């Protein structure tokens, strides 16, 4: 199976003694960074919905973005992203063999880099996939990346001998993948919390994001190849709900708040 997750806005730039690889779409990342650095501070602030301080920080990041960055200026992607999904993934605690397996079976969708392997070297950035950054390919990043993402995922799935993709990414990011061009069965797990208030279980964004990362970790640590094995996921107290699930949308529920 191939698993996809979203990146994160927050970064952990601690040094890591881990070998890194070069992103497949490094040239595109450079091209997009040059486009972004040409924006005024006000335009960048509006484009990404940033405060003044964050707009200045990300303008500086785009200005410093290098075509061939020094090793000390980069970090491995899965260890650098620090959002909710990555709390669930806990990439820093994966052992060497698990990271090697993840390198082939986990992909991170990115507004700047397109598709990243866990150990791909990234420079600090923030550029959400939903950003309406105008490029030579269109008026937003969906139009820029759509064909490339589908081709890259198809090729990687073929290289590891699978026709199944586990979508643990957000709608914002997976929406950049052209569905008709994706030659894979897509399974999208749903994670819900039951407050026992008579209103039924609900998706709570923070918990759902963390659970997606935990599901990716579950696949990695168990080296899953059979989609039916996803039903065994029970991290954090979640339990598979067969009566609410379909083959391509397994549903997992746990009591709220999480213990």
From Swiss-Prot:
Disulfide bonds: none annotated. GO terms for biological process: response to hydroperoxide. It comes from the Bacteria. InterPro entries: YaaA (IPR005583). GO terms for cellular component: cytosol. Pfam families: H2O2_YaaD. Belongs to the UPF0246 family. This is UPF0246 protein RD1_0358.
């Amino acid at each position: 199976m191939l698993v996809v997750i979203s990146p994160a806005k927050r970064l952990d730039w601690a040094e890591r003694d881990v070998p890194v690889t070069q992103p497949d779409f490094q040239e595109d990342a450079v091209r997009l960074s040059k486009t972004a650095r040409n924006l005024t501070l006000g335009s960048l602030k509006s484009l990404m919905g940033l405060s003044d301080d964050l707009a200045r920080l990300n303008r500086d990041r785009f200005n410093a973005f290098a075509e061939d960055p020094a090793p000390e200026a980069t970090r491995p992607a899965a260890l650098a992203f620090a959002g909710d999904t990555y709390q669930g993934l806990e990439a820093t605690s994966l052992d060497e063999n698990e990271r090697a397996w993840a390198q082939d079976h986990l992909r991170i969708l990115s507004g700047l880099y397109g598709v990243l392997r866990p150990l791909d070297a990234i420079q600090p950035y923030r550029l959400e996939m939903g950003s309406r950054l105008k490029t030579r390919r269109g008026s937003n990043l969906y139009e820029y990346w759509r064909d490339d993402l589908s081709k890259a995922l198809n090729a990687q799935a073929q290289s590891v001998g699978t026709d199944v993709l586990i979508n643990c990414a957000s709608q914002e990011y997976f929406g950049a993948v052209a569905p008709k061009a994706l030659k894979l069965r897509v399974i999208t797990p749903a994670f819900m919390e039951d407050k026992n208030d008579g209103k039924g279980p609900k998706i709570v964004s923070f918990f759902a994001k963390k659970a997606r990362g935990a599901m990716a970790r579950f696949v990695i640590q168990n080296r899953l190849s059979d989609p039916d094995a996803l039903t065994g996921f029970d991290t954090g107290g979640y339990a598979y709900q067969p009566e609410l699930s379909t083959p391509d949308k397994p549903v997992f529920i746990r009591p709220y708040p999480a213990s």
